[in-house]
Amino acid sequence: MSDPIVTSSKMEKSAEFEVTDSALYNNFNTSTTASLTPEIKEHSEESRNGLVHRFVDSFRRAESQRLEEDNDLEDGTKSMKSNNHLKKSMKSRHVVMMSLGTGIGTGLLVANAKGLSLAGPGSLVIGYVMVSFVTYFMVQAAGEMGVTYPTLPGNFNAYNSIFISKSFGFATTWLFCIQWLTVLPLELITSSMTVKYWNDTINADVFIVIFYVFLLFIHFFGVKAYGETEFIFNSCKILMVAGFIILSVVINCGGAGVDGYIGGKYWRDPGSFAEGSGATRFKGICYILVSAYFSFGGIELFVLSINEQSNPRKSTPVAAKRSVYRILIIYLLTMILIGFNVPHNNDQLMGSGGSATHASPYVLAASIHKVRVIPHIINAVILISVISVANSALYAAPRLMCSLAQQGYAPKFLNYIDREGRPLRALVVCSLVGVVGFVACSPQEEQAFTWLAAIAGLSELFTWSGIMLSHIRFRKAMKVQGRSLDEVGYKANTGIWGSYYGVFFNMLVFMAQFWVALSPIGNGGKCDAQAFFESYLAAPLWIFMYVGYMVYKRDFTFLNPLDKIDLDFHRRVYDPEIMRQEDEENKERLKNSSIFVRVYKFWC
């Protein structure tokens, strides 16, 4: 069957350039040719010198690297494209496991302890259910945009500049970069808190140094090391979540531990909501909302893999379905089970004010019921999970920073890619930011955790709002310019109204979080400036960058005119007739399949 994809006339045809190591290989051969003598000892010594020289030489700038500027956009937006690309050395097994496990870290495994302590299990479940709907709407919007613009430089970070405004794009993209920059020290701090479950008198800096050096070693030796370590880390995380679900059900039913049947005991005593007035309980739900955004953070990254799929029209619905299962099983189900097995007044939960406030609720779900050995295994896997997210942050942040430099949004000196495909200067900058993690040895460890987690959580609100608002603007621009949606390869199941709801809900969360930050829970309704900036720092930071870009560039465009948006820039246009023919053939093929195949296709 013919290909349904018709390339637009305005779509760029930039030739890919593969950075090779031929020069290094020739240098290596030159340096070792002289060693081919009868003396085996001399040959061995020269070979070792050649390997050392090759490793050192790999840190030099890739000779072919240069930037090309494209001014094709009608609204004047420039796309800075490099004709080299970062090395892609990961295999399909790496990508599959990362899509399942990446993002399962501090937000889900540790930060929810404070939410459970302050708000109770009822607020925890309500907050996660509400954010789950927005997550699905965002995934649908991102899927439609990703299939339509699979090769757009900057991917979903570029949507804002094209469909909204350049100032909105600058502020949101930089905040997204800052989010990943803060994740590294955040995870290092969390790792020290996790270790304190075993020994709370140990110097946290010892483990911070070990984990920090380990992460630097991985990333300065290339992407292959990152791919293999992430495959192992994510495998452990998925197995732990599956085992935790089974264990929690067994404990609750009285099959393990010393408490017998638990059922909904903790929802009655100490209760499903934390003590206090109705306003305090509502504040608890508002607090959980931002915590949930932090936990769901990273799920939007599935869009990045769309341009690597042979048939995005078919793979995107599959990815959307899997995101639903990830939401229902990994997030909602585990939150419900934690609420059933961990009382919210336990003094080991972070934020409870107890003497040992460093335990994850996943660990407490087993340890407080006197289940032996298992809590230590869970805590060890949580430690692996935390290091895994720090590993991902040190992989994503430098590449995002390098991309910002290529687009003209960051200093050009950060656009340095060495011969092994490492964004070297950006990697050094991100590594220096990780030094913030050494505050773990100070008494302000939990306070630093709150600051960093708040930046990351609110950043997701801006990023997701940008994706959904760009989707709305894309649909409107298509209508204004007389384009048919039949040209779109994948249309969001939730339509444009899902994006409207998501943007509206995010605005409500911003306002609710402002209230909670200004008058935090447990402060007697009094305002607290320090607590406000701890919880709401990302918002004034975004406003500063948004206004600063407007003033500096003297560009006060609030929204790009719909009729001026270049819809064809890096757009993939599909033939409606061929798509209908494909859909009919797929329906007929599915109709003639076995019941097992039909069930599988329906659910997966």
UniProtKB/Swiss-Prot annotation:
Family matches, as InterPro entries: AA-permease/SLC12A_dom, Amino_acid_permease_CS, Amino_acid_permease_fungi, APC_YAT
GO molecular function: amino acid transmembrane transporter activity
Intervals, Cytoplasmic compartment: 1-95, 141-169, 228-238, 306-323, 399-423, 471-502, 553-604
Membrane disposition: Multi-pass membrane protein
A cellular component annotation (GO) from this entry: membrane
GO biological process: amino acid transmembrane transport; amino acid transport; transmembrane transport
Modified residues (Phosphoserine): 14, 79
Subcellular location(s) per record: Membrane
Segments crossing the lipid bilayer: 96-116, 120-140, 170-190, 207-227, 239-259, 285-305, 324-344, 378-398, 424-444, 450-470, 503-523, 532-552
Domain of life of the organism encoding this protein: Eukaryota
Membrane topology, Extracellular segments: 117-119, 191-206, 260-284, 345-377, 445-449, 524-531
Keywords: Amino-acid transport, Membrane, Phosphoprotein, Transmembrane, Transmembrane helix, Transport
Pfam families: AA_permease
Similarity remark: Belongs to the amino acid-polyamine-organocation (APC) superfamily. YAT (TC 2.A.3.10) family.
Function comment: Involved in transport of isoleucine, leucine, valine, cysteine, methionine, phenylalanine, tyrosine and tryptophan.
Record-linked PANTHER family: AMINO ACID PERMEASE, LEU_VAL_ILE AMINO-ACID PERMEASE-RELATED
Name of the protein: Valine amino-acid permease
Organism of derivation: Saccharomyces cerevisiae (strain ATCC 204508 / S288c)
Lineage: Eukaryota, Fungi, Dikarya, Ascomycota, Saccharomycotina
